[in-house]
């Protein structure tokens, strides 16, 4: 509750309503598009916004299974993420989670924003770690999350290189 600011309180309630209208949490084949329930932009495709913003919300406000289904959505797309990385020249089980349609296919062409959005992998790891932090268990990591995090690590190990002039990885 935000006391003394009814407009902010109304805004928060509206946003919570939108989250609950957008996602029920009972089907791991479903996810939350970046525009949620009220916007058709992006065609309902999945970006990184869910992992950064929505997973923590659902972990803190609903039974943990609801947020776990958001994570399972990504876990079930791991084979497609590995295939996506392989098509781009990465190997050894590296995963690049695409901005996806419901079947896990990359939905953007290379020239658009496919390569500008590779930080989506990091948001998936963030959400997995948030799950463990907020639930106080390692169950999800042990059963599913570690496999995803290893594949993402394999991607980054091939994607970055050390810059001698900058003395850092780029």
What are these regions (language model features)?
Residues 1, 54-57, 71:
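Short, Φ-rich (hydrophobic/aromatic) sequence segments
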Residues 23-38, 64-126, 132, 139-143, ...:
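Helix-terminus loop motifs that line ligand-binding clefts
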Residues 136-139, 149:
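Residue-level recognition of short, well-ordered coil/turn positions
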Residues 9, 142-147:
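Alpha-helical scaffolds flanking conserved acidic
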Residues 1-41:
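Acidic/polar, glycine-enriched structural segments that form the non-catalytic walls/loops
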Residues 13-20, 40-44, 48-59, 115-131, ...:
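Contiguous, well-ordered alpha-helical segments that form the cores/surfaces of helical PPI scaffolds
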């Amino acid at each position: 509750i935000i006391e003394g600011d009814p407009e902010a309180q109304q805004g928060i309630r509206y946003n919570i309503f939108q989250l609950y209208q957008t996602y029920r949490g009972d089907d791991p084949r479903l996810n939350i598009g970046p525009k949620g329930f009220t916007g058709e932009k992006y065609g309902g495709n999945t970006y990184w916004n869910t992992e950064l913003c929505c997973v923590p919300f659902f972990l803190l406000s609903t039974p943990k299974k609801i947020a776990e289904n958001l994570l399972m959505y990504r876990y079930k797309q791991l084979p497609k993420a590995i295939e996506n990385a392989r098509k781009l020249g990465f190997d050894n089980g590296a995963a690049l989670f695409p901005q996806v349609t419901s079947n896990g296919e990359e939905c953007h062409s290379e020239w658009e924003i496919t390569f500008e959005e590779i930080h989506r992998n990091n948001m998936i790891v963030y959400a997995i770690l948030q799950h463990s932090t907020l639930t106080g268990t390692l169950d999800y990591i042990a059963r599913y999350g570690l496999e995803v995090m290893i594949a993402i690590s394999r991607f980054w190990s091939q994607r970055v290189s050390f810059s001698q002039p900058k003395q850092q990885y780029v």
